[in-house]
Amino acid sequence: MSYSEKPEDITKEEWMDKLNNVHIQRADMNRLIMNYLVTEGFKEAAEKFRMESGIEPNVDLDSLDERIKIREMVLKGQIQEAIALINSLHPELLDTNRYLYFHLQQQHLIELIRLRETEAALEFAQSQLAEQGEESRECLTEMERTLALLAFDNPEESPFGDLLNMMQRQKVWSEVNQAVLDYENRESTPKLAKLLKLLLWAQNELDQKKVKYSRMTDLSKGTIEDPK
């Protein structure tokens, strides 16, 4: 077939047959899983997986303890305690990462609003966040969006209610986790996440070239649709 000829379309069944014929070593898959558990700080799961798979992590799992404490604090909304622990572990981290520090302070403001502590929230925003808002347009926009929650009787149902969702705390924790790992010169992004990004990039390249292929539409379930 010459390069000018159009390649034959591959059906979903043919595509799945090709995938099923690709052999991946179980040990390689297990190492990907262990890497994810360690990077995300899931110590208990990593210990159990080590026993089940025989795969050794590339770090001492006890070194995850402090990150786990920080994660628990952030996910419980105990932001000031999390900041104190971060400062005790890495005194220069928040000084050199001002956006991370702002997002932690912003999250504390969100927690005050969640508790309906309006006066404390306004005072905290004025004393701790106003200066950063003046220096950064992005910070100012985020601060204004957060303070807008105070204008609603039921802020959870407002256009800005997503700030009060658990996913917001998770977002802040992910940022903290990556910053701590970077500061410690450790891998901050799981290899599995990098592979998924590579998959999305490859599919985007195929889409731009208008190639018909079996596209993965749901990464969490591995759902593959028929070629279009």
Swiss-Prot record:
The annotated consequence of gene deletion is: Morpholino knockdown produces morphants which exhibit loss or reduction of dorsal embryonic structures and Wnt signaling deficiency.
Q: Name one GO biological process term.
A: Wnt signaling pathway
Q: Which GO terms describe its cellular component?
A: cytoplasm; nucleus
Give the UniProt keywords, A-Z. Developmental protein, Wnt signaling pathway
Q: Which InterPro entries match?
A: CRA_dom, CTLH/CRA, CTLH_C, LisH, Ubq-SigPath_Reg
Enumerate the spans annotated as LisH domain: 25-57
The UniProt family comment states: Belongs to the GID8 family.
Protein name (record): Glucose-induced degradation protein 8-A homolog
**Organism, scientific name:** Danio rerio
